[in-house]
């Protein structure tokens, strides 16, 4: 009887320890979601609110190489925002100047960051700060006017380094 009690106690403690370990283990900080172009602002708000410094979301065409990426920056407690990053690479070469023209036509300031190596030679970078409307509208226009996709197109939102919902 006493040995049965000890055995049950050992299994009980082991189950509790395993449960605590599984509950406290690091959870994934990335996830995929299929969205319509009308959901871009919601996704960018999620990145801004729950993303870690340098967290990002990539909006991409399923089964295609075309994408638009936004990253989050945190410079200090009061200075955080979103940055659009559009690469100059073999797949995007045909779109690169069109993205620049779109930004210039909208009066949006951008900078070009040289990477100096690899297939991605440079990035167009736009600091949207906390302007979710501007960021979402620009992203949507890149998909519709530059990539020439139908407004009803669904894209994949791939989040990286974004805290899970509570």
Task: Kindly give the residue locations of the regions a language model identified.
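Juxtamembrane cytosolic interface motif at the C-terminal end of transmembrane helices
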Residues: 18-26
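Feature marks short, highly hydrophobic, charge-poor N-terminal signal-anchor/signal peptide-like helices
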Residues: 1-11
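Core hydrophobic alpha-helical membrane-spanning segments
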Residues: 9-19
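Structured alpha/beta or helical-core interaction and ligand-binding surfaces enriched in interleaved
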Residues: 25-166
């Amino acid at each position: 009887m006493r040995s049965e009690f000890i055995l049950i106690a050992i299994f009980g403690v082991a189950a509790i320890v395993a449960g605590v370990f599984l509950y406290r283990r690091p959870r994934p900080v990335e996830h995929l979601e299929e969205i319509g172009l009308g959901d871009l602002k919601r996704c960018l708000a999620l990145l801004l609110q729950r993303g870690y410094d340098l967290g990002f979301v990539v909006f991409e065409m399923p089964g295609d190489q075309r994408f638009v990426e936004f990253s989050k920056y945190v410079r200090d407690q009061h200075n955080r925002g979103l940055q659009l990053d559009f690469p100059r690479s073999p797949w995007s070469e045909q779109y690169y100047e069109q993205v620049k023209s779109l930004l210039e036509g909208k009066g949006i300031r951008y900078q070009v960051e040289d990477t100096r190596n690899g297939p991605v030679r440079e990035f167009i970078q736009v600091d949207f700060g906390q302007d979710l409307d501007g960021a979402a509208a620009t992203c949507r226009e890149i998909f519709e006017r530059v990539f020439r996709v139908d407004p009803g197109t669904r894209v994949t939102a791939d989040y990286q380094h974004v805290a899970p919902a509570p």
